[in-house]
Amino acid sequence: MPTTAFAGYPAPFIRETPSGRGKKKQQLLWGDFVTLLGEESGDWVTIRGRNEEGWIRRTKLQSERLLEVNFVDIGQGDGALIVTPDDRLILIDAGVDDHMFRFLSWRFNLRRHPDAKMRFRAAIISHSDKDHYGGFREIFDSPQFLFDAIYHNGLVERAGSNLLGERVPANGREYITDLVDDLPALQQRLADPQFVGNKVYPKLLKTAAESGRAESIRSLQATDRFLPGYDDTSELKIEICAPVREDVDGISGLRWFENAGKTKNGHSVVLRLVYHNVRILLGGDLNADAEHYLLGHYSGLDAES
């Protein structure tokens, strides 16, 4: 007998008693993971879902999990929650304020269950614009959220006149080569007060690194090919399309796009989700220069005009 199931369409309720007139305890969303607790009464069964226990009619459950992609209304900026078919959580950007934090608290019924913990397979900061990373502050501060990994694009803002680091000339262009690829490299930079200064983004990463709730913090790049755990052997594939790095005299670098703003946006983490016949492209905050660059990179044509 199966011990797990998923909420059916569109949004059934967990009830206090095995009756359609029973008090509603918690509404489920289509595809929500539930645990069957084993008690039955006619066509009613006991379950646990969204951190609540109670009764639900068996016909309101289904055996197949969905790929769930939530694009959250967070005001300015972007934020998305992905729930994979194997019931793993992936968070991509979080807006500028606490909208994503409040959505997650509602989505997983955390306010009523302050001791509950939610583990994310990944949190991805596509790039270091505040309207994409600002909302992570409350999330990284909360003991209710745990992360297998936090990913970013390798560009970490720092104090001083060179926001993204020194520009290195090569091949008639300029590149940023001072990239932060792993946790030791991040910790080394965060230990320098002159690096952090009053910049919000490195302070956010410092909060995450010192929280003890993130097992890994590292960069992503196109040569990684896939988000760890979702390669071409997985039912859900998550391809990493960008940022695309170049060799700069033996050092890995990201191309400079006119100014710091265009450069950090243009090197957003870009993901392509592939699930059966569904394709979803998550493009961060790409600009025209970056789009032409990526078109040229992947097509082999001269698209930079």
Model-derived segments and spans:
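Beta-loop motif signature
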Residues: M1-G42, R48
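Flexible, acidic/histidine-containing loops and adjacent segments that form or flank the divalent-metal
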Residues: W30-V34, G38-S41, I47-R50, Q62-L66, ...
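Zinc-coordinating Cys/His ligand positions in small cysteine/histidine-rich zinc-finger domains
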Residues: R57
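An acidic-aromatic substrate-binding cleft motif
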Residues: R65-R88, V96
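Residue-level marker for buried hydrophobic side chains located in beta-strands
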Residues: N70, I90-I92, I124, I280-L282
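Divalent metal-coordination and catalytic microenvironments
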Residues: D73, I82, I92-D93, H127, ...
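N-terminal cofactor/phosphate-binding cores enriched in small/glycine residues
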Residues: G79-I82, L104-N109
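Acidic, metal-coordinating catalytic cores used for nucleic-acid/nucleotide bond scission
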Residues: S126-H132
